[in-house]
Design a protein with these regions (language model features):
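N-terminal intrinsically disordered, cationic/polar leader segments
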Residues: 2-168
Length: 168
């Protein structure tokens, strides 16, 4: 029995050390939340090391309560923003992603521009192998708009690119 208790203790110590390594540099997770509703930027996003960088897999974030403002009228635009990516060396931390998305609340920007901004900011901090950002904007003025931004790492060979496309 004592032998099993020692093994469990060692396993917990290894898991705790691994968790500490993964969370180095993360400041938002587990901290009081301060919301910025008008200044979206890559500085709001945090990343942690991908523990499986040798494997291609898809991470999907869906933000169904996205809100921004029309830069001409100031009217709110509502959308569901979906981010899908195949991580390289880093993954985005989910609370920082939520805070980043909330930062668009009082930000005036056209739907096409802000969808591209989200993609650009995520590419900047993650350097993903593949990334797609899709914004499905609610109907306003009788027209619904869907914007899709696609990125594939240009440094990958054609075989790898085909494999990444097959993941979708």
């Amino acid at each position: 029995m004592a032998d099993i208790t020692k093994k469990i203790g060692k396993a917990r110590a290894v898991a705790t050390k691994t968790e500490r390594t993964e969370t180095v540099g993360l400041t938002k997770l587990g901290s009081p939340t301060s919301y910025r509703f008008d200044k979206p930027g890559p500085d709001l996003l945090e990343a942690f090391p991908n523990r499986n960088p040798g494997r291609d897999y898809v991470v999907t974030f869906e933000h169904p309560e996205f809100t921004s403002l029309c830069p001409m009228t100031g009217q709110p635009d509502f959308a569901t923003i979906t981010v899908r990516y195949v991580p390289g060396e880093k993954c985005v931390e989910s609370k920082s992603f939520k805070l980043y998305m909330c930062a668009f609340r009082n930000h005036g920007s056209f739907m096409e521009s802000l969808t591209n901004k989200i993609a650009d900011d995520l590419i900047e901090i993650l350097a993903p192998r593949r990334l797609t950002v899709t914004g499905v904007f609610n109907v306003r003025g009788g027209t619904g708009i869907t914007v899709r931004v696609e990125h594939i790492d240009s440094g990958l060979d054609s075989t790898r690119v085909r494999a990444l496309r097959d993941l979708w």
